[in-house]
Amino acid sequence: MESPVRFEHVDIATILKTLPHRYPFLLIDRVLNIRADHSGIGVKNVTFNEPAFQGHFPERPVYPGVLMIEGMAQTAGVIGIMSVEGTEKPRAVYFLTIDKCKFRKPVMPGDIVEYHMRSIGRRKTMWWFHGDAKVNGTIVAEADVGAMLTD
Protein backbone atom coordinates (compact mmCIF):
# COMPACT_ATOMS: atom_id res chain seq x y z
CA MET A 1 0.00 0.00 0.00
CA GLU A 2 1.37 3.39 -1.00
CA SER A 3 2.04 6.02 1.61
CA PRO A 4 -0.28 9.08 1.46
CA VAL A 5 0.84 12.12 -0.53
CA ARG A 6 1.77 15.09 1.70
CA PHE A 7 2.75 17.52 -1.08
CA GLU A 8 1.42 16.81 -4.56
CA HIS A 9 3.33 19.50 -6.48
CA VAL A 10 6.29 21.57 -5.28
CA ASP A 11 6.89 24.31 -7.86
CA ILE A 12 10.10 26.18 -8.63
CA ALA A 13 9.14 29.12 -6.38
CA THR A 14 8.88 26.78 -3.39
CA ILE A 15 12.10 24.98 -4.35
CA LEU A 16 13.88 28.36 -4.40
CA LYS A 17 12.60 29.00 -0.86
CA THR A 18 13.67 25.51 0.24
CA LEU A 19 17.13 25.02 -1.29
CA PRO A 20 20.05 27.47 -1.40
CA HIS A 21 20.97 26.45 -4.98
CA ARG A 22 20.63 28.94 -7.84
CA TYR A 23 21.38 29.09 -11.56
CA PRO A 24 23.38 27.47 -13.02
CA PHE A 25 23.39 24.82 -10.29
CA LEU A 26 19.71 24.44 -9.44
CA LEU A 27 19.12 21.20 -11.31
CA ILE A 28 15.44 20.38 -10.66
CA ASP A 29 12.35 22.17 -11.96
CA ARG A 30 9.71 20.71 -9.65
CA VAL A 31 9.09 17.89 -7.17
CA LEU A 32 5.96 15.72 -7.31
CA ASN A 33 4.18 13.45 -4.86
CA ILE A 34 6.21 13.88 -1.68
CA ARG A 35 4.80 11.08 0.45
CA ALA A 36 4.65 10.44 4.17
CA ASP A 37 7.27 7.68 3.70
CA HIS A 38 9.77 10.36 2.57
CA SER A 39 9.67 9.57 -1.12
CA GLY A 40 9.00 11.77 -4.12
CA ILE A 41 9.85 12.53 -7.74
CA GLY A 42 12.04 15.41 -8.87
CA VAL A 43 11.66 16.58 -12.47
CA LYS A 44 14.34 18.10 -14.71
CA ASN A 45 13.52 19.31 -18.22
CA VAL A 46 16.81 18.97 -20.09
CA THR A 47 17.21 21.62 -22.79
CA PHE A 48 19.95 22.33 -25.31
CA ASN A 49 20.54 25.62 -23.46
CA GLU A 50 22.07 23.84 -20.43
CA PRO A 51 25.51 25.39 -19.68
CA ALA A 52 27.07 21.90 -19.51
CA PHE A 53 26.38 21.30 -23.21
CA GLN A 54 28.94 23.94 -24.20
CA GLY A 55 31.64 21.40 -23.43
CA HIS A 56 29.84 18.05 -22.93
CA PHE A 57 29.81 17.49 -25.91
CA PRO A 58 29.19 20.25 -28.51
CA GLU A 59 28.84 17.85 -31.46
CA ARG A 60 26.76 15.26 -29.57
CA PRO A 61 25.38 16.76 -26.35
CA VAL A 62 25.01 14.32 -23.45
CA TYR A 63 23.76 15.51 -20.06
CA PRO A 64 26.56 14.80 -17.55
CA GLY A 65 25.88 11.92 -15.18
CA VAL A 66 27.31 13.84 -12.24
CA LEU A 67 24.62 16.49 -12.77
CA MET A 68 21.96 13.77 -12.61
CA ILE A 69 23.40 12.65 -9.27
CA GLU A 70 23.27 16.27 -8.05
CA GLY A 71 19.64 16.42 -9.27
CA MET A 72 18.93 13.31 -7.19
CA ALA A 73 20.56 14.94 -4.17
CA GLN A 74 18.57 18.16 -4.65
CA THR A 75 15.34 16.17 -4.92
CA ALA A 76 16.25 14.29 -1.73
CA GLY A 77 16.99 17.63 -0.04
CA VAL A 78 13.55 19.01 -0.89
CA ILE A 79 11.90 15.79 0.33
CA GLY A 80 13.91 15.82 3.56
CA ILE A 81 13.36 19.50 4.36
CA MET A 82 9.64 19.38 3.57
CA SER A 83 9.27 16.22 5.66
CA VAL A 84 10.53 17.87 8.85
CA GLU A 85 7.59 18.76 11.07
CA GLY A 86 7.23 21.98 13.05
CA THR A 87 8.58 25.47 12.65
CA GLU A 88 12.30 24.71 12.98
CA LYS A 89 12.92 23.84 9.35
CA PRO A 90 16.51 23.10 8.33
CA ARG A 91 17.96 25.74 6.03
CA ALA A 92 20.75 23.81 4.36
CA VAL A 93 21.41 20.35 2.99
CA TYR A 94 24.94 19.04 2.70
CA PHE A 95 25.55 16.21 0.26
CA LEU A 96 27.73 13.63 2.07
CA THR A 97 27.86 10.29 0.27
CA ILE A 98 27.30 8.61 -3.08
CA ASP A 99 27.14 4.82 -3.20
CA LYS A 100 26.18 2.18 -5.77
CA CYS A 101 26.16 4.76 -8.57
CA LYS A 102 25.50 3.48 -12.09
CA PHE A 103 24.92 5.30 -15.36
CA ARG A 104 22.88 3.17 -17.74
CA LYS A 105 21.84 5.32 -20.73
CA PRO A 106 22.73 8.78 -22.04
CA VAL A 107 20.37 11.70 -21.46
CA MET A 108 20.00 14.15 -24.34
CA PRO A 109 18.46 17.59 -24.88
CA GLY A 110 14.67 17.28 -24.95
CA ASP A 111 14.58 14.50 -22.35
CA ILE A 112 12.57 14.88 -19.16
CA VAL A 113 14.42 13.24 -16.28
CA GLU A 114 12.43 12.03 -13.29
CA TYR A 115 14.40 11.47 -10.07
CA HIS A 116 12.47 8.81 -8.14
CA MET A 117 13.84 9.14 -4.60
CA ARG A 118 12.91 7.23 -1.45
CA SER A 119 14.35 7.36 2.03
CA ILE A 120 16.27 4.23 3.02
CA GLY A 121 17.44 5.45 6.43
CA ARG A 122 17.59 8.32 8.84
CA ARG A 123 19.57 9.09 11.99
CA LYS A 124 19.09 12.49 13.64
CA THR A 125 19.98 15.03 10.92
CA MET A 126 21.44 12.41 8.53
CA TRP A 127 19.28 11.01 5.72
CA TRP A 128 19.99 8.33 3.11
CA PHE A 129 18.01 7.93 -0.10
CA HIS A 130 17.94 5.51 -3.00
CA GLY A 131 17.28 7.12 -6.35
CA ASP A 132 16.48 6.02 -9.88
CA ALA A 133 16.75 8.61 -12.65
CA LYS A 134 14.27 7.73 -15.39
CA VAL A 135 13.51 8.99 -18.89
CA ASN A 136 10.21 7.73 -20.33
CA GLY A 137 10.09 5.09 -17.59
CA THR A 138 13.55 3.68 -18.39
CA ILE A 139 16.25 3.87 -15.70
CA VAL A 140 19.15 5.99 -16.98
CA ALA A 141 21.07 6.27 -13.68
CA GLU A 142 20.80 5.10 -10.10
CA ALA A 143 22.55 5.80 -6.81
CA ASP A 144 22.26 5.89 -3.05
CA VAL A 145 22.93 9.36 -1.66
CA GLY A 146 23.43 10.60 1.88
CA ALA A 147 22.88 14.10 3.18
CA MET A 148 22.83 16.12 6.37
CA LEU A 149 20.07 18.64 7.07
CA THR A 150 21.26 21.56 9.15
CA ASP A 151 20.69 25.18 10.11
UniProtKB/Swiss-Prot annotation:
Keyword Lyase attached: yes
Catalytic activity as recorded in UniProt: a (3R)-hydroxyacyl-[ACP] = a (2E)-enoyl-[ACP] + H2O
Keywords: Cytoplasm, Lipid A biosynthesis, Lipid biosynthesis, Lipid metabolism, Lyase
Statement: the UniProt record of this protein carries the keyword Acetylation: no
Gene Ontology CC entries for this record: cytoplasm; membrane
GO biological process: fatty acid biosynthetic process; lipid A biosynthetic process
Subcellular location: Cytoplasm
Any one Gene Ontology molecular-function term assigned to this protein's record: (3R)-hydroxyacyl-[acyl-carrier-protein] dehydratase activity
Active site positions, chain numbering: H56
Coiled coil residues, start to end: none
EC numbers on record: 4.2.1.59
Entry-linked InterPro entries: FabA_FabZ (IPR013114), FabZ (IPR010084), HotDog_dom_sf (IPR029069)
Task performed by this protein: Involved in unsaturated fatty acids biosynthesis. Catalyzes the dehydration of short chain beta-hydroxyacyl-ACPs and long chain saturated and unsaturated beta-hydroxyacyl-ACPs.
Similarity-based family: Belongs to the thioester dehydratase family. FabZ subfamily.
Protein name as annotated: 3-hydroxyacyl-[acyl-carrier-protein] dehydratase FabZ
Biological source species: Nitrobacter winogradskyi (strain ATCC 25391 / DSM 10237 / CIP 104748 / NCIMB 11846 / Nb-255)
